[in-house]
């Protein structure tokens, strides 16, 4: 079970980290189908999810299943690179 399945508030940071790695670093940690599922789940729970970076995530991007065009903070970039180092 993925961490965002246990804690819906983790959908935002994982969406942002996966998007940064994929669109900015050409690194894919999960399959496209799993990313699409993450986007769909986040879209369904969007109104109830709380996270400091929620403002970076639009319902339009989630509907399209993309994180292209996001302006990533240094915290997101750093966290994504740490995730890459530890991902199994």
Give the ranges of each region predicted by the language model:
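Phosphate/adenylate-binding "loop-and-lid" substructures adjacent to NTP/NAD/dNTP-binding pockets
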Residues: 1-88
